[in-house]
């Protein structure tokens, strides 16, 4: 929004030219030389004497680069360019205009006093300075005003003076004997219209702009601030003082700034106590500007209304105190910094009311609410019913539709009954409030629910919740009924878990499984042999975990690449020592069967390790130690991505013994029982989520075991290659706990302690020294646990 186009920046040149022509060629009045002009013309240039001037009866004074003392003009015209005007004598102002006087000034400095715009006078300032400093004042002086717009007792109405203040600095100090109504004011208006534009800056020791409704004021006083700044010292940026019924129209636009020394952007009160009968109206519009401060209406002493509108991406960070009506729309925002009250609140499409910043909890009280698609933003310490929260209290009716967004202010999440009350409606509850985004605390998901009493609550469970009259029959909305026989209590619905909790659990499970492998995974099925071996192995696994609390469905996909090589052999090749490295990754999905929301978990990392084994004829013993580091991520719908790191030590001890059980043709069959123990020591960073939830691992270390039986055949192909198919059954017993604590409330995945696997595959060893083996397997467990895996390995002996 603009008050004026660029063509208005210096409209004074054409009138000036016309005035000069009229004065020099058409007027029969002679040119005056100094002091007083009565229907005459004078020019002051650099080096001319510094004098006071008094103009009457359509006189014209031109000051070009010169300096004067106080100038007073009635029904006359002034043009100042690169000039200086000093307040002199006992005058209160540097320039005083009355009647139909006009002042046009460019790059001029006014010292010691301001400009007085009386009656129907007009002022246009471009790139000027009005400077009133303490050293410019006389002892006992009470009046220091940059620009004053008022009326003179001797003049007749109408009083419709105008001032356009363009790219000008106004700096005003307090008077030695200050008065709130007359000292340290950048602008004081009792009539007319003032436009403050194009980077103008007002720095006032008291109030930046004072609009004063007196018994002699005009019915409407208008103030426009466009791309400019008003800064006050001890008072409000803008003050409206009401002593008689008046309408005040104030617009702040295009990146303007208001800085109130007392914390008020706008203060509406009275100056002299009782106000004359009748209502005053203050219309305060903020357009495409961001302001910080309060809007305060002294409704106890002033009769009327304060109507506030935010539009075109405007924002106010502050309190609204006794505001009659507020309209927030067009991508505009009101960020409350404390409790506020508004008569009628209209929240338009794209508008936002943020009830707080999360550092404290605020209450907004309104008489009527109308929603047209805007958003209410609440900060809530998500927990049980008693949780602290921002709150909207509607004393009257609520109509329309509005969105609700909830930010968790450090709540750990908890089970709710009736819920956390966000919106209290005293009248007709006809409005629809819809939760946008997600409200999550700890491991729980919260939902916005309308209760039977018409109020709106956050609940961590689905369903309508318990009947409040059953919980507490003494509530005011409950109608007494005859007692009935007691019935068994109804279990409240369980709280709703958020899917991110499942993603954390899935990541923990995946990391625990990343490095696990057996002797046969490295060795294949070969017996001990001379020589050094290098080997490589890839595998992929898909796991489906049991639903967490019958709500979260978890699926985990893992893959890894392992590389290793022997670095030494002993005992005639029966024993060998080697090193190995692992690169692994996991991708998990957690989906809520209740809400439909989902989250993804990812784990990426690697490990280095050493191994050693000894094998002779039918027996083998194997041991390994690995250390891994992993990067973890969790991404929920509509939530910020969470990142954290983990470290893992894992050691394994394994042994097996082979029994020959016969032949099928030329293939020898053997049966090998195996036993393996795995110890895991995992350290996961304590992570604080963006919403404040503290997440830590609980019980991700411990001892696990495997007992297996392997049926293997050994034969040779026509080309002389050794072929060894196998079939294996394994029983896995997990001793390590699996759990994640969300703000100290532990949630566990449904990973069965006992799992059972069947696998099959084959190994082929060629005469050239190459060998390859691979296989696939399936695993089952309680609670619907399922897993499928496939692997392929290559080795070379030299």
Residue ranges and their predicted role:
Residues 188, 224, 257-259, 269, ...:
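Membrane translocator/pore-forming domains, dominated by Gram-negative outer-membrane beta-barrels
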Residues 37, 43-49, 53-62, 66-68, ...:
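Beta-strand-rich solenoid/repeat architectures in extracellular/passenger domains
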Residues 54-59, 70-79, 91-103, 114-124, ...:
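Right-handed parallel beta-helix/beta-solenoid
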Residues 84-132, 598-636:
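A generic tandem-repeat structural signature
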Residues 37, 45, 49-51, 260, ...:
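Extracellular beta-solenoid/beta-roll
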Residues 147-156, 209-210, 214-223, 227-231, ...:
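Glycine- and acidic/polar-rich repeat regions and solenoidal domains
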Residues 1-34, 612:
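Gram-negative bacterial Sec-dependent N-terminal signal peptides
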Residues 3-4, 377, 388, 405-574, ...:
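Outer-membrane translocation/initiation segment of Type V secreted surface proteins
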